[in-house]
From Swiss-Prot:
Similarity comment: family membership: Belongs to the prespore-cell-inducing factor family.
Pfam families: Dicty_CTDC (PF00526), PA14 (PF07691)
Protein's recorded name: Protein psiF
Membrane among keywords: yes
Xref: NCBIfam families: Fibro_Slime (TIGR02148)
Natural source organism: Dictyostelium discoideum (Social amoeba)
Stored InterPro entries: Fibro_Slime, PA14/GLEYA, PA14_dom, Prespore-cell_inducing_factor, S_mold_repeat
Amino acid sequence: MKYLFIAIILILYCSFTKADQKKFLVNMYDNDPLFSPDFENANGAQTGLVKKKLGSDGKPIPANYDMKDPNGNYYIKNATTFKSWFNEVAGVSILVPFELVLTQTAGSQNYYSYSNTSFFPLNELGWYNPSIKGDYEFKKYQDSNKKEQNFHFCMHASFIMSTNCKEVFKFKGDDDVWVFINDVLVLDIGGVHGVQDGTVDMANLPEKIHDSTNSKLGNCKNGTYPFDFFYCERHTKASNCLFETNMGFTCSYYDYCGICNGKGECCTDVKLNQCYTKKCPLPNSLPNGATNYQDYMTIVPTNTCGGTDKCKIYSCNNSTGCEFKQKSCDDGDKCTKDACDSKTGYCSNIPTNPSVVTSCLKSGCDSTTGNYSTPTNCDDKDPCTIDSCINGQGCVHTKACDDEDPCTTDSCSADGKCTHTAIAKCNSDCPSCPSKKCKITSCSEDSGACNYVDMVFASPSECYKATCDPETEEAIYSPIDSSCDTSDSCFTAQCNLNKTCTRVPAINCDDNNECTTDSCSGGSCSNTAIACDDNDPCTIDTCSPSEGCIFTPIVCEQTSLCNTFTCSVGKCVPTPITCSSSVKCQDSICREGVGCVYFNRTCPPDDDCSSAYCSMETGKCISKAYDPLPFSCQSTAVKVGVGIGAAAAAGIAIGGAVAAGLAIFGGKKAYDTWKTSRGNVMTGSQSNPLYTQNQNNGNNPLYSAPAE
């Protein structure tokens, strides 16, 4: 009798309960061994084929290339072949949308499952679509029942889940399966293999899925996360895909392709020419769920045509692509050497030779001709002097009318004419007197004796005294003050009124470059590069010949919609963007390639016998036991049919199917007690047809009249 009761209870439960469904449009990618060597290789199960974090495109990244099984078969040949697994690649894989229908598990409100032991969703689709197949001759593959099937495909299903770290996801099937939560790998069943199973237990995750540093949280933290399910069928002769979960999968958005949390993969960028591309819009950017993405495509540059040589000016030619011309640093000065620094792009215009200034020479450069060396002009405009320049002293102006006759007086007129007037009683026939170094010889008219007078030389300035060189009888000019010493050829001395000198550069070593320190030593110029270092690793230190040191902050390229990149210790470091909402019961999350998305909060229940919702008053989740409870949540007494009436009389909450069992086996009183405990939803016992009196005045054997 007990077993009959249980059977009736189950029959009634199933008949009174309509299975709920959740439908999600996901992406399938049809491959074929004709194009991809990764398919139809019997290489066995293998973990570690993909990295533990999803790539920036939200797809797995292969971790081992050229890895082979003992028979020499590839697991994954290379990154190029792997790309077609979860991407549409022209001539290799074809994108096909697929409706994944999850069915509520019988006897449980919170569990949903998918079960297919003959999982061939792409038969007559993808490469096997007659309109696409064309002239390709595909090998025909059969299952164990000799039926032709499309075995070679992959699937990516993306959901959003809210967790309190109690949920589970159970999978059973073949071949590759990878599950990522918040982009972190939590289930790895890779390789071509027979049916295998695996479980994601949120309470015991193998990897940390959150960023909190609180060690007490473990690998799971209550919150909302993306859930990505990657599946591949890569080999004959069976295809199984079964999973069950109480993770409340939802979609944060649908892209314009209709895909749950999709990346807009039905849209393909169109290359217009060598320089411009018509780019697809962001997956969730169309207004009001529109699907006409073609109207929202934008034209963007295909090639930035940049290069490492900053002395080249790059541009793009629509026909030929990138081209460049050399940057001009010509300053129009023929006395400079023009150059461009390929690392910085700065121009330098360095003098070809430094300007040399001495007492008698100005070695400058004529910017229009490029000619050098200009003698010092010592012309004093006096016709009565002979103008010359003595190196180290400068200009010397010697009287022009000296006839070297001791018996004449020499003079010069304003027009430069010399006059030599004889000196009276001067004996020019004086006997020959022996010469003496640095002496002027004369003879006395009266005595005929030789007279010697020291040679006197005119000094070029008040700062020098002139003496006679006893060897050459030429003038030697010595500085009166040490400040007038010109032994260093890098300087010349400028005489002051107080008979001291001011040292001024004799050689111009300025190379017109703010990036060098200019100096002179031993008559030679030195131009030493300065060090531009501000000790900040987040600046690019360069030097401009016209401006000197320039410290340019490193600007990090913003390549992500979910991270902001800033410089730290010389590297661009991502900081996650916080997507927050002030609207109660609205959740938010950031998806790479999409940005921030906002959606109604889904609350995880406390257990499998409860449902949860978000309170619009508090914005917090509230978990509440199902009423009536699902059969699986009933007490043992109810499940086995022991003491049914007592259970109802005791006020145990039970469902309609069990209530029907009570009506059959527990008697009307038990049923009435259950009905009363339901809050008088029914108005009377007559609401149950099993307890309605026979309208033909006959006896209903299951009906007992109310006690008087």
